[in-house]
Swiss-Prot record:
<dbReference type="InterPro" id="IPR040223">
    <property type="entry name" value="PAR_bZIP"/>
</dbReference>
<dbReference type="GO" id="GO:1990837">
    <property type="term" value="F:sequence-specific double-stranded DNA binding"/>
</dbReference>
<dbReference type="GO" id="GO:0000981">
    <property type="term" value="F:DNA-binding transcription factor activity, RNA polymerase II-specific"/>
</dbReference>
<dbReference type="InterPro" id="IPR046347">
    <property type="entry name" value="bZIP_sf"/>
</dbReference>
<protein>
    <recommendedName>
        <fullName>Transcription factor ces-2</fullName>
    </recommendedName>
</protein>
<keyword id="KW-0804">Transcription</keyword>
<feature type="region of interest" description="Leucine-zipper">
    <location>
        <begin position="144"/>
        <end position="172"/>
    </location>
</feature>
<dbReference type="GO" id="GO:0000977">
    <property type="term" value="F:RNA polymerase II transcription regulatory region sequence-specific DNA binding"/>
</dbReference>
<keyword id="KW-0053">Apoptosis</keyword>
<dbReference type="GO" id="GO:0009887">
    <property type="term" value="P:animal organ morphogenesis"/>
</dbReference>
<keyword id="KW-0238">DNA-binding</keyword>
<dbReference type="GO" id="GO:0006357">
    <property type="term" value="P:regulation of transcription by RNA polymerase II"/>
</dbReference>
<dbReference type="GO" id="GO:0042802">
    <property type="term" value="F:identical protein binding"/>
</dbReference>
<feature type="region of interest" description="Disordered">
    <location>
        <begin position="184"/>
        <end position="211"/>
    </location>
</feature>
<comment type="subunit">
    <text>Interacts with NFIL3 transcription factor homolog atf-2.</text>
</comment>
<dbReference type="GO" id="GO:0005634">
    <property type="term" value="C:nucleus"/>
</dbReference>
<feature type="compositionally biased region" description="Basic and acidic residues">
    <location>
        <begin position="111"/>
        <end position="152"/>
    </location>
</feature>
Length: 211
C-alpha cells in the first residue's frame, strides 16, 4: 500500500483517528487538517511539509556549528587570555631559555671624597686576602707538580727493575737448557756403548757355537 492510499484510508475514517491522536498526545489540536493537507499535497505531487515541526538538516541554523574560521578565532581568543598567555610564557621560559648564572657586578669608581681610612683599610684587607689566595693556589700547584715528578721517577725505576728481572730470567732459562743438553748426550753415549757390548757378546757366542 502506498502513501496516498494510506492517507485516503485515514481521511475516510476520521472519527476513529481523532481519539487515537488525542490519546497519544499529538502536539496538534486539529488532526483532520493535518491529514487533509498531507492528502492534498500527495495527490498534487507536491513536496510535503513536515507536520511535526521537524526541520531537515539543510534548513537548520548554522550559528551553533563551528566553521574552520570560527574555530581559529576561538583558539586565538583562548591564546590571548591572560591566564593562558601567562602559562605559555612561563612554560616557554622554563623550557627554552637556559638558567642564567649570576653575573658579577660592574665595578663603579668610588669618588675621592669617599676614600677615607675605612676604605683604605678594607682595600688592604681585600689585597691581603687575594694575595693569600694566590699563594695558596701556587703552593698547591707546586705540590701537585712535585708529586707528579716523584711518581714519574718511581715509574722509571720500576720499569728498570722489571727489565733487569726479565734479563735475569732469560739467563737462568738459558743455563737450565744448557745443563739439560749434556746430560742427554751422556745418556745417548751410554746407550750406544751398551748396544755395542751386546753386539760383541752375541758375536762371541755365535763363534763358540760354530766350533
Amino acid at each position: 500500500m502506498d502513501f496516498h492510499r494510506a492517507l485516503s484510508a485515514l481521511f475516510t475514517n476520521q472519527a476513529a483517528v481523532q481519539p487515537l491522536l488525542g490519546s497519544l498526545g499529538f502536539p496538534f489540536n486539529d488532526g483532520t487538517s493535518i491529514l487533509t493537507t498531507a492528502l492534498a499535497a500527495q495527490s498534487g505531487g507536491k513536496k510535503l511539509d513536515t507536520p511535526l515541526g521537524i526541520l531537515p538538516f539543510d534548513s537548520l541554523p548554522t550559528t551553533n556549528l563551528l566553521t574552520p574560521t570560527k574555530k581559529i578565532k576561538l583558539e586565538d581568543e583562548l591564546c590571548a587570555s591572560p591566564v593562558s598567555s601567562r602559562s605559555s610564557t612561563v612554560s616557554s621560559s622554563h623550557f627554552s631559555s637556559p638558567q642564567r648564572s649570576p653575573s658579577r657586578k660592574m665595578s663603579v669608581p668610588i669618588p675621592e671624597e669617599k676614600k677615607d681610612s675605612a676604605y683604605f683599610e678594607r682595600r688592604r684587607k681585600n689585597n691581603d686576602a687575594a694575595k693569600r689566595s694566590r699563594d695558596a693556589r701556587r703552593q698547591k700547584e707546586e705540590q701537585i707538580a712535585s708529586k707528579a715528578h716523584a711518581l714519574e721517577r718511581e715509574n722509571m725505576q720500576l720499569r728498570g727493575k722489571v727489565s733487569s728481572l726479565e734479563q735475569e730470567a732469560a739467563q737462568l732459562r738459558f743455563l737450565l737448557f744448557s745443563k739439560i743438553s749434556p746430560a742427554n748426550s751422556e745418556v745417548s753415549c751410554e746407550s750406544n756403548d751398551s748396544t755395542e757390548t751386546n753386539d760383541s757378546n752375541d758375536s762371541k757366542s755365535d763363534s763358540t757355537i760354530e766350533v
